[in-house]
């Protein structure tokens, strides 16, 4: 089982996302269920290592957001066109 630490995003938009990526992080979102969507930021290198395993896409993951655990599944993963980088992930609540 994968556990990923995440932070709630304070800024949103193209410029904020570019600043995150320059700081070796990337934006993501958690949605689904009866709760409101949560915009988060993740550490790129840690998630990149985890997503190399096939189980990342099929198992329920645990995101720790501000000390609270959220069970999710990876719904959509966006990658850079030619660099080995993740640019965004959509998580759906499990």
From Swiss-Prot:
<dbReference type="InterPro" id="IPR020056">
    <property type="entry name" value="Rbsml_bL25/Gln-tRNA_synth_N"/>
</dbReference>
<dbReference type="Pfam" id="PF01386">
    <property type="entry name" value="Ribosomal_L25p"/>
</dbReference>
<dbReference type="InterPro" id="IPR020930">
    <property type="entry name" value="Ribosomal_uL5_bac-type"/>
</dbReference>
<dbReference type="InterPro" id="IPR011035">
    <property type="entry name" value="Ribosomal_bL25/Gln-tRNA_synth"/>
</dbReference>
<dbReference type="InterPro" id="IPR029751">
    <property type="entry name" value="Ribosomal_L25_dom"/>
</dbReference>
<comment type="function">
    <text>This is one of the proteins that binds to the 5S RNA in the ribosome where it forms part of the central protuberance.</text>
</comment>
<keyword id="KW-0694">RNA-binding</keyword>
<keyword id="KW-0699">rRNA-binding</keyword>
<dbReference type="InterPro" id="IPR020055">
    <property type="entry name" value="Ribosomal_bL25_short"/>
</dbReference>
<dbReference type="GO" id="GO:0022625">
    <property type="term" value="C:cytosolic large ribosomal subunit"/>
</dbReference>
<protein>
    <recommendedName>
        <fullName>Large ribosomal subunit protein bL25</fullName>
    </recommendedName>
</protein>
<comment type="similarity">
    <text>Belongs to the bacterial ribosomal protein bL25 family.</text>
</comment>
<keyword id="KW-0687">Ribonucleoprotein</keyword>
<keyword id="KW-0689">Ribosomal protein</keyword>
<dbReference type="GO" id="GO:0008097">
    <property type="term" value="F:5S rRNA binding"/>
</dbReference>
<comment type="subunit">
    <text>Part of the 50S ribosomal subunit; part of the 5S rRNA/L5/L18/L25 subcomplex. Contacts the 5S rRNA. Binds to the 5S rRNA independently of L5 and L18.</text>
</comment>
<dbReference type="GO" id="GO:0003735">
    <property type="term" value="F:structural constituent of ribosome"/>
</dbReference>
<dbReference type="GO" id="GO:0006412">
    <property type="term" value="P:translation"/>
</dbReference>
